[in-house]
Amino acid sequence: MIGSLCKNEAATKDVLRSVKAMGYDEIELNGFMTHPTSFFVRMLTKLAGMPTGKAGKYDWKKLVRDAGLGVTSIHFDLGTLERDLTACIQEAKDYPTSRIVVTGMYRFDYSDLKALEELSARLNKVGEQLAQSGIELLYHNHNVEFKRVGEKNQFAYEILMERLNPDWVNFEFDSYWAAE
């Protein structure tokens, strides 16, 4: 994750130029990197192995543009999308990208079938609204979606695949977390 290398703005510029020099044309941005976060959130992400430092204070649109990179997608948490969808759509278009990613949520109970059904409904609703604005919603897994659920003993990920409408929500499969 490049965020761990972005110790300060100068280092971030160097990292982005190096990414471009390696032949990449686009990067994916995470909301922890692109928005100021509280000390508590920075500590949690650091403990999870995803340190972000003070990257939320940088002008990422300018940094990415100056490095000659594009943005393939940007992450938002589901709560932010539900609370302020218009601002999220505008931010995606400002980068510009046509993809928004929601990640698996650690405070969510993936072993509860009813909760998974409710999560699917929420994701479908946001995905439908984003689709109307020309933006695709992607669901990015972590290891928590690989808990067994219900009488069929399915993975939570399988239940999400069954319940999410592919016209509104697609998947960004992270094999690292699936193998963990």
What are these regions (language model features)?
Residues 35-40, 108-113, 146-148:
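A short acidic, helix-capping loop that chelates divalent metal ions and anchors anionic groups
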Residues 70, 88, 92-117, 169-180:
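Repeat-unit-sized solenoid/scaffold elements
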Residues 27, 128-180:
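Acidic/histidine-rich catalytic cores of soluble enzymes
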Residues 1-5, 30-34, 76-79, 105-107, ...:
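Active-site beta-loop-alpha junctions enriched in small/polar residues
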Residues 13, 52-57, 85-86, 115-123, ...:
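Charged helix-capping and loop-helix junction motifs
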